[in-house]
Amino acid sequence: MRKQIFETLRLEKIVGGGQAIGTLDDGRKAFVWGGLPKELVTIRVTKKKSHFVEGIVTEIIEKSPERITPKDENSYLSTSPWQIMPMSSEQSYKASLIEEAFLLHNITLPEKIEVFSDGVEFNYRNKVEFSWFGDKTDDDEKETLDLAFFKRGGKGKVVVDGT
C-alpha cells in the first residue's frame, strides 16, 4: 500500500466541477473536494502530478462561515459536493464560474449572470454513476449485493442505504 500524503493549505476559490483550489507551499495547485474558499484545511492527496495535486479534505482547521453540515455526510462527496454550502452560495459560485469562463475567452457579458432555480435543494441529480458492492453479512451467513456510488478520489464505493 502506498504511503498516504497529507498537505495543509488555504483554499482560494471554487472551480468547475465543485472542487476548491489552493496553492501548496511548493507552488503546485491543489484541486480539493470537500473544501470552501478561505478555509484552512488538511487534505489527503489522491493524485500527484508535477504541476498539481488532487485531494480530499480530512480536517478543517479554519472553517468558512458559508459551511453547513451536508444532508448526507456519508456520500455527499460522491453524489453532490455542493451540499456543504447553502443554496444561495452554490448559485453565486455557479454564476461566477460562468462569468469566469466568458472572461477567459475575452467575452464581455451585457449583464451579470443570474442562476435560476426551482428552489429544490435536494433529491435532484444531473448525472448518476452507480456500481455494485458485494459483501458478507456480519454473521458471515449470506452474501449481499448492494447498489453503490463510486467514492471520489479513490477506488472505494459508498453503499446506497436501503438497497
Segments the model singles out, each with a brief description of its role:
Residues 1-163:
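SAM-dependent transferase fold signal centered on methyltransferase-like domains
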